[in-house]
């Protein structure tokens, strides 16, 4: 029984941060930067902007704000070498208050290496309604938000120097593999 039905599953050795750092090595990038705090500057220095933030925010909520879901994590260290035997177990029943439990060591430790450390770290992920000031994670796929997104998309379709990509900019849920494939197919 598996939540994912992909033929192959995995994460890069060292994690996605290490992968992205390697991909961006030698590329002029700005991260951890509030685009909107100095928007004119960034638009002036870049021939092309890859925007992965909220599309409604990009257009200063011209129509109204889109709705999102967010998550919160509760993380704890447990005095057991192997809590659940897998990196991620998803819970879809109504009785369980969290959506998944992540046991971090299983992402890069296998076999005896799991048991070499007598403790483990787990995170429980809880889905919750998004409010201003919270980090948005997921779009809400209902008629109201889909229609509203289409209005923003019409504006985005007329942009010549901005590529809108990812969950927030395209207001679409993506798993990791499809979004990586989409990025690799991008024509800049």
What is the predicted function of each stretch?
Residues 3, 51, 81, 160-166:
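Short, functionally important structural connectors and interaction interfaces within domains
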Residues 30-34, 104, 165:
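Conserved beta-strand termini and adjacent loop/short-helix elements that scaffold enzyme active sites
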